[in-house]
């Protein structure tokens, strides 16, 4: 059976006690906006009374919509809770991996020669000739499995940390712990390294400190960290030294950020994080010149 639709009955008409869309249905309820009689099927609950389908459509059509540009500005503005930094880091890693793929990397085995990987990877004691690699090393990955695991970990750890710390502190934590991972490789391993796992271990270390401060049980975090450290140590081809270096720096920065969280200590916090970065860079430079 198909419901028929007829024009609204004028005010005062005897049909006023029948739904304007379904004349065979008696009703004593009217739309709060236009006064049309509407049956239960045609009623949409409003803040005051009920509305008919036409008034609902008109209201939706006239509702102001924010342009895409405005939505983007709101998303990236300081103070936004959207994890833009985390998603940006993941996006850069994916783009770099695709560039590696099209320039010679075998994404399944990690074999092949890619100039992108070669130019962005970190080589021990090479900070003087390729200083950018202490940053770009975080965006290079060797295989599908490598980038999949790291990006999942970055998403799981990065989103809550970015919302807790804010975008600027989160990025500072990521990149400084990444330098800490490079220091671990520079002093205790003599092989090129790629991947964001060292920085992710740094995020995990800081997350443990913040979770303990908030009274959250950290047993599961300890288990995750221990298992991944063990995997890195016993499975060949994984730079566990980077994991340890990033983790140590992450724990230290976690304490620093907590101790200087008050607004009045903002300058102390900035100076402290910058100081840690300078010490790490000095260690790399000294090791390269030794």
List the model feature ranges, each with a label.
Residues 30-38, 116-125, 144-145, 168, ...:
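Hydrophobic alpha-helical transmembrane segments
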Residues 126, 133, 224-248:
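Short alpha-helical packing/oligomerization segments
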Residues 174-177, 220-229, 271-277:
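Central hydrophobic cores of alpha-helical transmembrane segments
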Residues 95-99, 180, 184, 188, ...:
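Alpha-helical membrane-inserting segments
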Residues 147-154, 194-206, 239-257:
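Alpha-helical transmembrane segments that form the membrane-embedded catalytic/substrate-binding core
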Residues 82-196, 236-238:
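N-terminal TM1-TM2 helical hairpin plus the immediately adjacent luminal interfacial "cap"
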Residues 1-78, 234-290:
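C-terminal transmembrane module of polytopic alpha-helical membrane proteins
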Residues 162, 212-216, 260-267:
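Membrane-interface helix-boundary motifs at transmembrane edges
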């Amino acid at each position: 059976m198909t419901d028929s639709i007829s024009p609204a009955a004028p005010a005062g008409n005897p049909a006023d006690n029948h739904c304007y869309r379904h004349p065979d249905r008696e009703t004593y309820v009217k739309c709060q906006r236009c006064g049309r009689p509407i049956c239960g099927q045609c009623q949409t609950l409003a803040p005051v009374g009920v509305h008919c389908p036409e008034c609902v459509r008109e209201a939706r059509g006239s509702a102001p919509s924010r342009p895409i540009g405005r939505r983007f500005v709101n998303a990236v503005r300081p103070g936004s809770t959207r994890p833009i930094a985390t998603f940006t880091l993941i996006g850069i890693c994916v783009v770099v991996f695709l560039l590696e793929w099209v320039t010679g990397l075998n994404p399944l085995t990690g074999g092949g020669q890619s100039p992108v990987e070669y130019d962005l990877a970190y080589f021990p004691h090479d900070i003087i000739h390729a200083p950018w690699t202490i940053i770009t090393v975080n965006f290079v990955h060797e295989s599908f499995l490598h980038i999949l695991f790291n990006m999942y970990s970055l998403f799981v750890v990065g989103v809550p940390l970015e919302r807790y710390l804010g975008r600027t502190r989160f990025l500072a934590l990521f990149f400084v712990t990444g330098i800490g991972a490079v220091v671990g490789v520079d002093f205790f391993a003599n092989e090129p390294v790629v991947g964001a796992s060292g920085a992710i271990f740094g995020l995990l270390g800081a997350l443990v400190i913040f979770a303990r401060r908030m009274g959250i049980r950290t047993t599961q975090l300890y288990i995750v960290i221990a298992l991944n450290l063990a995997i890195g140590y016993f499975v060949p081809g994984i730079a566990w030294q980077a994991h340890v270096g990033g983790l140590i720096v992450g724990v230290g920065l976690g304490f620093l950020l907590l101790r200087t969280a008050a607004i009045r200590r903002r300058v102390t916090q900035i100076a402290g994080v910058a100081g840690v970065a300078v010490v790490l860079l000095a260690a790399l430079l000294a090791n390269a010149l030794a």
